[in-house]
Amino acid sequence: MTSIEFIIPSVLTKGSGEKKIPLDATDLQDAFTKVTEQLGEDFKRKVLDLSGKPRSLINIYINGKNMRFSNDGMATKLNNGDSIYILPAVAGGSDLKNEDLQRYSRQIMLDEIGFVGLEKLRKAKVCVVGVGGIGNPVVTQLTAMGIGKLKIVDRDIIEISNLHRQHLYTEEDIGKVKVEAAKARLEQINSSVQIEALPNSVTKYTAENIVKGFDIVVDALDSIDARYALNDACIKLNIPLIYAGALGMLGSICTIIPNKTACLRCIFPALAEDDMPTCSTEGVHPSILYLVGGIQVSEVVKIVLG
């Protein structure tokens, strides 16, 4: 019997670290059969299809050589001392780098995301309008999850009163433009994400140009007039819009799918800017901002993954 080593990356072991399993096996099929017997049904479901063959998103390496296009396939004979390494691939067959596997391993493990979901996230283009109290956790989480392109829009300057709830910023950032400081910090979190910073106001004249070309828009604004303008632009351009607001200890979230759900004007048909309470007058608990921002991120991911 041939003695070999079967190496499984941590992304396929529920985060318990890379496993190196010694086996006696004659060929690849024999090796896969024995390793799945050891690791159980959950592992088997992740790497093998119903016919018992490796799934199309699993690359197999013997001594560093990719065996996907080997003529012998799963009947490839093994030699003493061979090392088998399996590496997940993303849709289209391109390999994930090992660094990516480590960075995103905890979300790849989720059946709801997986490798295909990660690739969809890496291709998605999301525009977040407002990088204040709600926008901070939204852009941080989207960046950390590996969204492909992120546009952040806000005209405001960082003030000391922002710091208790807007945790992308520090005391050294006071006086800086929010989107510029946020972009610099987000690029430190994940340099692979393409980030565009736009220090502009959102009005009925600018909204369409701001969101055009994006897959999803996140409303993290604090002005009802700007919210209406953003809503109207997304409805016209058929772009999903995820609204959220928070004040005091309360928050609200609404996902708007053009031509399928109610829009912001349907829900709030006649709100006036001068009548709206704000964080400046009413206050806000930081935790509620993370709750509603987290739900917005969850809604973004659901739309991206389909």
Where are each of the predicted segments found?
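Adenine nucleotide-associated cytosolic modules
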Residues: D95-G306
